[in-house]
């Protein structure tokens, strides 16, 4: 044979061996999965599901429990009779396919069987859990019934032993106890006839009702005590306080009808008792709170009247004296005004105000007479009288404050006049000092605007003297002239300082600039202009500015240096 044929034979043999090895491997894997399925099937089949179902059957369930059990039982019958046989058939088919080397079909069959058994395992687990819940519910009912009955028995015993604490509510409590007992009987019937689920619901309801009734019984004694003892006692005390209030000649405000309010309180007390018998505890509490609030409101009315009476008795006894005191003050104030007006002109209408106070006093006097008559008649609540008394007192206090204010104003007129006189004399002295100071400067003359300012200020001061010298002084006019004169003097002093400083500096700078006059034509011209402004125009500010600029041309900084030396050594003028 040729080498090519040999190679082909070898390759073919290798392929056959490889395929055989693959087939054996695939068959082995599928076989392992089939064996695992067999084991899972046997384990599932060996579970004691039937025994568990048979034990529940012996419980003879009825009602809702029986319906649930039938559903689980039917599901188990379907599994055991149909699903297991179908699973056996699928596993057998997979074995046949695997043995005949139909690997891919065998794998599909195994996969289907695995999915089927997984679903069956879930179903069996669900059946077992459902059956176990029925059994567990029965056990829970058996355990819980005793606890619930103990709660009920304890509650019934407590109510029976303390019946006197519950008053008329005892009848309603016994009705609720009877209803709970009926629920327990219903539970026993359901549980004994094999319906643990519905029985559990009834037991839960009975226990909830027992706990709720226990909570109610714990609150009732407190409400009973409040309704039957505390509130009646409080109302009795309120009635006694009311009788005492009336006996002591107190009058209630028109909007307070004591009998209606007492009847209303009694009605709310009866309503709270009725609501308690219906176990409307929240509404009972609301009614009792309302009673408490209205009782306190009545007491506050009584207290307000008591307090008002004390105030009326304390203040009304001195009202006449207070009015007379203010009236005397008013009379004296009018005399003082008449005396003051001989020397001063009053511009504040003080006399008109004081006469107005007199009229107001007459009105208040009439009010006081009426108040005293009402007090003696005992026909008006003291709270109303107290407000009127307070109003009169407040009015009298306001009048007295205004009287004092006017009196202080009148007393201060002499001081204001004296102060103005001193200021006028000081200004007159300062004007003379300014005049002498300027004259010492030996200036060729004074600018017109400065002279106008000086003479205007002098006229202001003379006007002030003139007003002060009148027979009757208008202090407002005086004060105005003082203010204006003060401002004028301030302006004049500043103008005097600027004028004299610039005049002296202009002379000093001109003398200093003369050293450059012969050698510098600009300086010569600047000196000429500065002298013209100084001697002819009497413009000392202009002369100072002109010579300062001229010096800056030939010797920068000279004007500033000379000015600095001047201000450093300059003595303070006498007028400052």
From Swiss-Prot:
Coiled coil spans: 105-134, 254-305
Keyword Cell wall biogenesis/degradation in record: no
Signal peptide: none
GO annotations of cellular component type: plasma membrane; septin ring
Localization annotation: Cell membrane
Example GO BP: septin ring assembly
Side of membrane Cytoplasmic, spans: 27-576
Bilayer topology annotation: Single-pass membrane protein
Pfam name, any one: EzrA
Keywords: Cell cycle, Cell division, Cell membrane, Coiled coil, Membrane, Septation, Transmembrane, Transmembrane helix
Spans within the Extracellular topological domain: 1-7
Segments traversing the membrane: 8-26
Family, per entry: Belongs to the EzrA family.
UniProt cross-references to HAMAP family, sorted A to Z: EzrA
NCBIfam families registered for this protein in UniProt: PRK04778.1-4 (NF003410)
Summary of the function given for this chain in its UniProt record: Negative regulator of FtsZ ring formation; modulates the frequency and position of FtsZ ring formation. Inhibits FtsZ ring formation at polar sites. Interacts either with FtsZ or with one of its binding partners to promote depolymerization.
Protein name per the record: Septation ring formation regulator EzrA
Record organism: Lactococcus lactis subsp. cremoris (strain SK11)
Gene name in the database record: ezrA
């Amino acid at each position: 044979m040729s080498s090519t044929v040999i190679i082909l034979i070898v390759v073919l043999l290798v392929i056959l061996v490889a395929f055989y090895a693959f087939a054996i491997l695939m068959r082995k894997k599928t076989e392992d999965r089939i064996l695992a399925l067999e084991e899972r099937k046997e384990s599932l089949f060996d579970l004691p599901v039937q025994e568990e179902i048979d034990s529940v059957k012996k419980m003879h369930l009825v009602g809702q429990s029986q319906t649930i059990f039938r559903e689980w039982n039917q599901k188990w019958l379907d599994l055991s009779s149909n699903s297991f046989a179908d699973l056996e058939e699928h596993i057998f088919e997979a074995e046949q396919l695997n043995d005949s080397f139909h690997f891919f079909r065998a794998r599909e069959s195994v996969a289907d069987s695995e999915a089927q058994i997984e679903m069956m395992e879930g179903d069996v687990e669900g059946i077992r859990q459902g059956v176990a819940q029925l059994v567990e519910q029965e056990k829970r009912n058996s355990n819980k019934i005793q606890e619930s009955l103990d709660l009920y028995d304890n509650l019934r015993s407590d109510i029976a032993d303390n019946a006197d604490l519950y008053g008329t509510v005892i009848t309603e409590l016994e009705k609720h106890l009877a209803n709970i007992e009926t629920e327990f009987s219903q539970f026993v019937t359901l549980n004994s006839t094999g319906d643990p689920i519905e029985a559990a619901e009834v037991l839960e309801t009975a226990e909830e009702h027992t706990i709720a009734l226990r909570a109610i019984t714990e609150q009732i004694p407190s409400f009973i005590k409040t309704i039957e003892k505390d509130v009646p006692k409080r109302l009795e005390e309120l009635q006694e306080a009311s009788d005492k209030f009336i006996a002591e000649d107190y009058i209630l405000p028109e909007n307070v009808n004591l009998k209606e309010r007492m009847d209303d309180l009694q009605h709310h007390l009866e309503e709270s008792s009725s609501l308690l018998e219906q176990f409307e505890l929240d509404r009972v509490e609301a009614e009792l709170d309302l009673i408490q609030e209205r009782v306190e409101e009545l007491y506050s009315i009584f207290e307000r009247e008591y307090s008002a009476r004390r105030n009326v008795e304390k203040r009304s006894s001195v009202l006449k004296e207070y009015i007379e005191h203010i009236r005397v003050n008013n009379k004296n104030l009018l005399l003082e005004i008449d005396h003051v007006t001989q020397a001063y002109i009053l511009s504040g209408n003080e006399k008109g105000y004081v006469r107005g106070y007199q009229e107001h006093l007459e009105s208040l006097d009439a009010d006081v007479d009426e108040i005293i008559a009402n007090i003696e008649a005992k026909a008006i609540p003291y709270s109303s009288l107290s407000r009127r008394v307070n109003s009169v007192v407040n009015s009298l206090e306001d009048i007295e404050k205004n009287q004092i204010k006017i009196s202080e104003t009148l007393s201060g007129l002499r001081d204001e006049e004296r102060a103005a006189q001193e200021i006028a004399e000081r200004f007159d002295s300062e004007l003379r000092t300014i005049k002498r100071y300027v004259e010492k400067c030996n200036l060729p003359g004074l600018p017109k605007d400065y002279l106008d300012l000086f003479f205007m200020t002098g006229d202001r001061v003379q006007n002030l003297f003139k007003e002060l010298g009148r027979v009757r002084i208008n202090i407002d006019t005086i004060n105005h002239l003082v203010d204006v004169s003060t401002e004028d003097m301030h302006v004049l002093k500043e103008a005097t300082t600027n004028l004299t400083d610039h005049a002296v500096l202009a002379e000093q700078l001109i003398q200093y600039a003369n050293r450059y006059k012969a050698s510098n034509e600009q300086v010569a011209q600047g000196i000429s202009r500065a002298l013209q402004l100084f001697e002819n125009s009497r413009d000392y500010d202009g002369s100072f500015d002109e010579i300062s600029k001229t010096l800056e041309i030939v010797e920068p900084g000279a004007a500033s240096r000379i000015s600095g030396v001047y201000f450093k050594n300059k003595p303070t003028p006498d007028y400052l």
